A protein has these predicted regions:
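Bacterial N-terminal signal peptides
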Residues: 15-25
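Bacterial N-terminal signal peptides that target proteins for export
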Residues: 2-16
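Coiled-coil-like amphipathic alpha-helices with heptad-repeat character
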Residues: 8, 25-28
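Acidic, polar-rich low-complexity tracts and alpha-helical solenoid repeat scaffolds
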Residues: 2, 27-294
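Low-complexity intrinsically disordered segments
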Residues: 11-12, 23, 76
Length: 294
């Protein structure tokens, strides 16, 4: 009996030994697999890897490499540049809120950095692009009909670039983008003014048109605002002010359709009943129609 028990215990010991070896091998494999390939990589190599990923348009991969660099090497010129390029990668990937957060963190940490003008410029790009990006792509919504809080922040960012860093390489483009944003804000006011006009609220329509002219002079919609002022004064029975508006408009845009009694025209009512038609600006539609006739 003793000999038989010893013989039977041998296979058991062999099986137990095999199980130990299997578990050990599995553990080693998992440890190797779980180890990040970038861990321990020299800072120069890690930065070069992230930069190459950016050049190839792999924004997510670049962001990951730059974040790994910052985690492993929290100080130094490579770290500062990696933080900047990580924010750019986030912006290019459409992660605008993340980009703005990264930029704000950098500005707080390095307020006098040599590339600080670029950071404000990039924040302007991200803020100007962050509002309902998906909806604009799918439904082609007019930019002036959106919430304008982030475009206004973008305008403030570009204004910082032009005022604090007028000689930077980003100042000229920032000025141009400010002009475009002012037109968006003016269009927003024009759409509101036309909304009131369509409903016969002529005092409110005149007030919006006046605000547009005072707040956004020389915008692309200034002549429309003058025309709407004239139309409002006609309906309010103020012939003198209506005639003044007509004279001003004739000097600045003699071909404006209001002078021929053919303005404003509103979108066809059936369009508003179609949920798939997209939201269009009455101001833009009328202005584009005039431009096409020229």
């Amino acid at each position: 009996m003793i000999r038989r028990s010893l013989l039977l215990s041998a296979p058991v010991r062999i099986t137990a030994l095999l199980l130990v070896l299997v578990f050990a091998a599995t553990g080693c494999h998992r440890g190797t697999k779980g180890k990040n390939a970038d861990e321990g990589m020299p800072v120069e190599k890690l930065y070069e890897k992230g930069h190459k990923l950016m050049e190839g348009g792999n924004w997510s991969g670049a962001e990951s490499s730059f974040k790994r660099l910052v985690a492993q090497y929290p100080y130094g010129p490579y770290t500062e540049q990696a933080m900047i390029e990580s924010a750019y990668a986030q912006y290019k990937a459409g992660k605008n809120d993340d980009a703005v957060s990264s930029i704000d963190r950098f500005i707080r940490t390095y307020p006098t950095h040599r590339n600080i003008a670029y950071l404000y410029y990039l924040r302007g790009l991200a803020n100007g692009n962050s509002d309902t990006v998906f909806l604009r792509r799918v439904w082609s919504l007019d930019s002036s009909r959106r919430d304008l809080s982030t475009p206004r922040q973008a305008y403030a960012d570009f204004n910082i670039v032009t005022e604090r860093y007028p000689n930077s390489r980003y100042a000229a483009d920032a000025r141009q983008r400010m002009i475009e944003l002012r037109d968006v804000f003016a269009q927003h006011e024009m759409d509101n003014a036309l909304y009131y006009a369509r409903r016969g609220a002529w005092i409110s329509a005149a007030g919006r048109a006046t605000y547009l002219l005072e707040t956004y002079p020389q915008s692309a919609f200034q002549n429309d605002a003058v025309a709407l002022l004239g139309e409002s004064y006609v309906h309010l029975g103020n012939k003198a002010l209506a005639d003044d508006a007509r004279r001003v408009l004739a000097l600045n845009e003699p071909g404006h359709p209001w002078l021929q009694g053919d303005w404003p025209k509103y979108p066809w009512i059936a369009r508003k009943l179609n949920p798939f038609a997209g939201e269009k600006s009455a101001a833009t539609g009328q202005r584009n129609a005039r431009m096409n006739r020229k």
